[in-house]
Amino acid sequence: MSCLFNSYDPYFKQPFGAVRAGQSVHLTLRIPEELGYVDPHLVIQKEGKYDVPVHYRMKFDGQTPKQNHFSVDLTLNDVGLYFYYFDLYPDFRRIVRGPDNCGVVSWQEGEKWQITVYEADFRTPETFKGKVFYQIFPDRFCEGVENKPMPFPDRLYQADKHAEPFWQPNETGGHLNEDYFGGDLKGIQLKLPYLHEMGVDYLYLNPIFEAHSNHRYNTADYLNVDPLLGTNEDFETLCKEAAKYGIGIVLDGVFSHTGSDSRYFNREGRYGEGGAYRDPNSPYRSWYDFDPKYKGGYRSWWGFETLPEVNEETPSFVEFITGKGGVIDTWLRRGAAGFRLDVADELPDAFIEKIRAAVKRVSPEKFLLGEVWEDATTKYGFGHRRTYLLGKGLDSVMNYPFKNAVLDFVKGKPAQQAAGEILSICEHYPAPAINTALNFLSTHDTERALTVIADEPANGRGREWQSGRNVSGEAYEEGMLRLRMAYAIIYTLPGLPCLYYGDEIGMQGYRDPFNRGYYCWDSHEERLKPVLAQLAQLRHSCEAFRTGALRVLRAEGGVLHYQRVGATETAEIIVNRSEHIIVEPLASGKHTEVNPMGFTIVVEENGHNPNHSYYDIQ
């Protein structure tokens, strides 16, 4: 039986994907005659405590050989998630979502399709669309000021830049992350020409605020740069110098918790006798929840006593972060292009909305990104479905589902599985959000992509097993080919590709701390750099990569073939994971060869007499 309905196919659903509130949706069913007489109804329900299913009778549109066609138009005015299927009267059969998103006939309840309805006025920064990101873990990128003194005596300087980050537990079984390789803001500034050559438009920096660990996710002072990285003036200079290369800087904001070793909490006493832990009358006391029922006597992030949680609904904390002259306002006016919110799915929607207001108050072109690991439209938290991607909160999110789909594909899983996972996110996310989603293969929180592709899974084996592991020989060579394919996909999907520092030279490592090694500036691994630079150049030159629609033409086995369709140009991408050359038909009717473990990109001008440009990047 042929497909009865597929929301990815424009024949069955228009427009594709999420819609603005008040926008019309057209749905079509294709019913085989073998099903007999049917009177199909759309059954759709908005997710909400008091919402009930609504039935729409579908009109008969005519026949084709052995098939009847029915359609319905509807307008969804209320923002939220809607779930739908089709009833086939007069009996109790229904059409539900089956494998590969195709509608199948069932006598029982089944999976439903989703429509995301977002705020009619939702916009994301135009200046970010079509651009390329580069993520830097500041302590491990480049040391611009050498032989600088440690600003605090409990920091350990690592002079050997090839050394492995500390991983062995201390005498109490903990990890203090006290080893510093000396990367700083001046070092980033020194490497701006290199980043420009790589086609980078924006830097995403892991936290730079004063904090007493090398990762700096335990903020000690929100308003000052960590002294080992430089000064506030150094940050402003970096922003100005980066702008000369067309590069903006997005900062990491950690607002769900602070450090216990901070001027706000001050458990360790580094900041005198003030702070919420030591002084019951501290102005910061109301930020935290002190109660004997908690380990250590206060609520902390996932039980880590060095990370006391803040109450993001406390008015003084909200004002400190989002008010005029507050944290957001201060850093954007110092030159930052936006913020990435750490653990955004653990922040209340109302707090995120106030952060958005603070960001957009400086400029609508400032960017607000959130860390969410799953489909951000279906995430639950605080007892309800989260709404931060529906137009009043985040501009977009980190796109972990794309990462997982792409890495699984280049490692050997079927292309149709990757295509389905990618299309699901594209369908669920508002267009302004999917066009600014951060697409990556590695981060400071995950194994490096080359390790995932070429080495064994850790499978729960600890740091002692992970330490010192690096693939070489044939495994390394094949891994680099697969990494090249993976980045070709990441650079050509909807959203903003993000290169994690060192991936371009094949750096390896399992999770923290092994994925946070110092950048090997003396590396001789050069083969991926020109490929990434060419992909960035292609993104900049072809408008289809800015906001073009995604259309999958073929996803079968080791072949992934898709288009990005823009207003004036169409880009066609064919990725061949197999070990032999394939000859693939293009949408234009022509054919192209694609090398084993390779990819080809064809850009075509839309119109009757198109020009073709072929990019077979070796």
Give the ranges of each region predicted by the language model.
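Glycan-association/targeting regions that enable binding to alpha-glucans and other polysaccharides
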Residues: 1-134
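Conserved, mostly hydrophobic/aromatic
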Residues: 29, 136, 195, 205, ...
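C-terminal beta-strand-rich structural cap/linker in extracellular carbohydrate-active enzymes
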Residues: 31-33, 132, 592-618
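Aromatic/acidic polysaccharide-binding cleft in carbohydrate-active enzymes
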Residues: 139, 382-383, 435-471, 487-525
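Active-site-proximal helices and loops of the catalytic beta/alpha 8
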Residues: 239-248, 256-257, 262-273, 327, ...
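Glycan-recognition and catalytic regions of carbohydrate-active enzymes
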Residues: 424-427, 500-501, 505-571, 577-580, ...
